[in-house]
Amino acid sequence: MNLINEKLNNLENNATKSPKEAVILLNMGGPNSLYEVGVFLKNMFDDPFILTIKNNFMRKMVGKMIVNSRIEKSKKIYEKLGGKSPLTPITFALTERLNKLDPSRFYTYAMRYTPPYASMVLQDLALKEVESLVFFSMYPQYSSTTTLSSFNDAFNALKALETFRPKVRVIERFYASKKLNEIILNTILSTLNNRKSQDFVLIFSVHGLPKSVIDAGDTYQQECEHHVNLLKELVQQKNISFKEVLLSYQSKLGPMKWLEPSTEELIEKHRKSHIIIYPLAFTIDNSETLYELDMQYRLMAERLAVKEYLVCPCLNDSIEFAKFIIELVNNLKSE
């Protein structure tokens, strides 16, 4: 009987100690299997922040055509990555690390286009009787196509839970943080692995957007350019020199005018140099970093006889990035 009482007391104590604040890392998601490739593409191209066609019927029709034209190619890409996107398991590993480093909060994640969706995660947090939330965008720079889309989805999911009304705060961008940029620079230097930085053209490659999105008022291009300028300043402060430091845009889709220069253009332009690429718009590795940058563009670099071609990893579940996230949330609490 004493053993039973002891276990009941432990359960009560654990319930009392359960964190009352949760931090939800928001990202785009990625297929967790080849079966989910279709789900991922369908949800992405049905997103009005991605495919900005106001008429729902027309958007679904156009989205369906895009999905049908891309699904087999996308499946082949994910086959090369082991049959799934690395984004979800890496994000899970990051939350595991965060929960160990900061047990005062509960860290979890929600994806925009694949499970776990925000609605699923928020239902779980409601059962946990969480009192406050932080919606944490995993995109360093703000864009309506990423940050706003994720926040809109999360707030709509929260609104649907009529009896769950926690206090909500948001972290919508963090590219200007010197701490973040020091972590990025250290990642670049680690990838160089004692090679001479002055021999390398450093290309900060970010996900591209149609020019029309920027013309409509999206601040993404401005923030990416500002981010690169901050990193240039940091490089100078640390007395590190590169042959050149450049910004480029990848992943162009369709015939529309997109942001320039493209990453492919810069690789070709600097084919007689050593090149190192850092994926500046992503914090977690995904198909655009591991396939597009590290496989597809690497083959291009080899074909062009680029002297050396290096691709840096994203911040992923590194302890440095985890500590940075905790610091951002702590600073948010004191504001």
UniProtKB/Swiss-Prot annotation:
Keyword match Metal-binding: yes
EC number: 4.98.1.1
Catalytic EC class: lyase
Major localisation: cytoplasm
Keyword Metal-binding: yes
Cellular location(s): Cytoplasm
GO CC terms of this entry: cytoplasm
GO terms classed as biological process: heme biosynthetic process
Binding-site positions, Fe cation: H207, E288
Recorded metabolic or biological pathway in which this protein acts: Porphyrin-containing compound metabolism; protoheme biosynthesis; protoheme from protoporphyrin-IX: step 1/1
UniProt xrefs under Pfam families: Ferrochelatase
Keywords: Cytoplasm, Heme biosynthesis, Iron, Lyase, Metal-binding, Porphyrin biosynthesis
Gene Ontology terms for molecular function: ferrochelatase activity; metal ion binding
Coiled coil: none
NCBIfam families: hemH (TIGR00109)
Family: Belongs to the ferrochelatase family.
Annotated protein name in UniProt: Ferrochelatase
Organism, scientific name: Helicobacter pylori (strain Shi470)
Name of the gene encoding the protein in the UniProt record: hemH
